[in-house]
Swiss-Prot record:
<feature type="compositionally biased region" description="Basic and acidic residues">
    <location>
        <begin position="38"/>
        <end position="58"/>
    </location>
</feature>
<feature type="lipid moiety-binding region" description="N-palmitoyl cysteine">
    <location>
        <position position="18"/>
    </location>
</feature>
<dbReference type="InterPro" id="IPR004983">
    <property type="entry name" value="Mlp"/>
</dbReference>
<keyword id="KW-0614">Plasmid</keyword>
<comment type="similarity">
    <text>Belongs to the Multicopy lipoprotein (Mlp) family.</text>
</comment>
<comment type="function">
    <text>An outer membrane protein that may participate in pathogenesis. Some human Lyme disease patients have antibodies against this protein. The Mlp proteins probably undergo intragenic recombination, generating new alleles.</text>
</comment>
<feature type="region of interest" description="Disordered">
    <location>
        <begin position="26"/>
        <end position="58"/>
    </location>
</feature>
<feature type="signal peptide">
    <location>
        <begin position="1"/>
        <end position="17"/>
    </location>
</feature>
<keyword id="KW-0732">Signal</keyword>
<protein>
    <recommendedName>
        <fullName>Lipoprotein MlpA</fullName>
    </recommendedName>
</protein>
<dbReference type="GO" id="GO:0009279">
    <property type="term" value="C:cell outer membrane"/>
</dbReference>
<keyword id="KW-0472">Membrane</keyword>
<keyword id="KW-0449">Lipoprotein</keyword>
<keyword id="KW-0564">Palmitate</keyword>
<feature type="lipid moiety-binding region" description="S-diacylglycerol cysteine">
    <location>
        <position position="18"/>
    </location>
</feature>
<dbReference type="Pfam" id="PF03304">
    <property type="entry name" value="Mlp"/>
</dbReference>
<keyword id="KW-0998">Cell outer membrane</keyword>
Length: 148
């Protein structure tokens, strides 16, 4: 009976020591998981990049003159919805429209230039309200250079 008691005590000690190792292992695993989580969070925080708007994507493809006239057009259209609609058109048509605006505004000089540019803004607003397909030399022409 004594031997059984001694063996039983040894068994309990052995079982207890195994359990304590498992606790340490669990604690280490928990700490490693937390540190991995922190590492992952820092990586996730560094990588999220705000998607670029249509305007930013278009600006990357435009020349400096075209960017200037895009700003002018944004101001002319005023309503964000109209400008967003304009940005939805085909890139080549947008570039053609901006080049047309540049050529027309280059004609405006002299005493009445500011008044003529304001009138041209209104003309552009009206021309673009029907879409970009008809925009150009037919319906978006300034009175600049007509001798006035």
């Amino acid at each position: 009976m004594k031997i059984i008691n001694i063996l039983f005590c040894l068994f309990l000690l052995l079982l207890n020591s195994c359990n304590s190792n498992d606790n340490d292992t669990l604690k280490n695993n928990a700490q490693q998981t937390k540190s991995r989580g922190k590492r992952d969070l820092t990586q996730k925080e560094a990588t999220p990049e705000k998607p670029k708007s249509k305007e930013e994507l278009l600006r990357e493809k435009l020349s400096e003159d075209q960017k200037t006239h895009l700003d002018w057009l944004k101001e002319a259209l005023g309503n964000d919805g109209e400008f967003d609609k304009f940005l939805g058109y085909d890139e080549s048509k947008i570039k053609t429209a901006l080049d047309h605006i540049k050529s027309e505004l280059d004609k405006c000089n002299g005493n009445d230039a500011d008044q003529q540019k304001t009138t041209f803004k209104q003309t552009v607003q009206g021309a673009l309200s029907g879409g970009i397909d008809g925009f150009g030399s037919n319906n978006a022409v300034t009175t600049c250079g007509n001798g006035s």
